[in-house]
Amino acid sequence: MKTKLKIGDSVKILSGKDRGRIGKIASINRKKNKVIVESCNMVKKVIKARTPQEKGRIIDKEAAIDISNVMIFVKGTSSRLGIRFENNEKIRYLKKNGQRI
C-alpha cells in the first residue's frame, strides 16, 4: 500500500488503546504497512539477563500501528493527504482545507 506519510509527521491515532493521541512518526515499514509513533502504543518487553551477574528487566517499547489507523494532524486539523504538482514540484496538502504541508 502506498502512503504519503513521512518520518517526523504529526499524526493522530484513530483506533486502539491510544485513540485520539497525537505523536510524531518515528519509523515506517512500507512492506508491512506499519508505523511506529513516538510514545504511543507502548508495550512491555522482557529483556533476559545475558550473564549471571546481569539482571533481567522489563522495558516499555513502542509497538507498530497499522497505517490505516493513523491520520496526519496539522495545526489542530486532522485530514487525509493529497498530492499535487505546482511549478513541477510535488506538494503534499490536506484534502479537508487545501492547506500545504
UniProtKB/Swiss-Prot annotation:
Pfam families, alphabetized: KOW, ribosomal_L24
SUPFAM superfamilies for this protein: Translation proteins SH3-like domain
Keywords attached to this entry: Ribonucleoprotein, Ribosomal protein, RNA-binding, rRNA-binding
Cited InterPro entries: KOW, Rib_uL2_dom2, Ribosomal_uL24, Ribosomal_uL24_CS, Ribosomal_uL24_KOW, Translation_prot_SH3-like_sf
Keyword Ribosomal protein (UniProt): yes
GO BP annotations listed: translation
Annotated GO MF terms: rRNA binding; structural constituent of ribosome
PROSITE patterns recorded: RIBOSOMAL_L24
UniProt GO cellular component terms: ribonucleoprotein complex; ribosome
Subunit-structure text: Part of the 50S ribosomal subunit.
Task of the protein: One of two assembly initiator proteins, it binds directly to the 5'-end of the 23S rRNA, where it nucleates assembly of the 50S subunit. One of the proteins that surrounds the polypeptide exit tunnel on the outside of the subunit.
Similarity remark: Belongs to the universal ribosomal protein uL24 family.
PANTHER family cross-referenced by the UniProt entry: MITOCHONDRIAL RIBOSOMAL PROTEIN L24
NCBIfam families tied to this protein: rplX_bact
Listed name of the protein: Large ribosomal subunit protein uL24
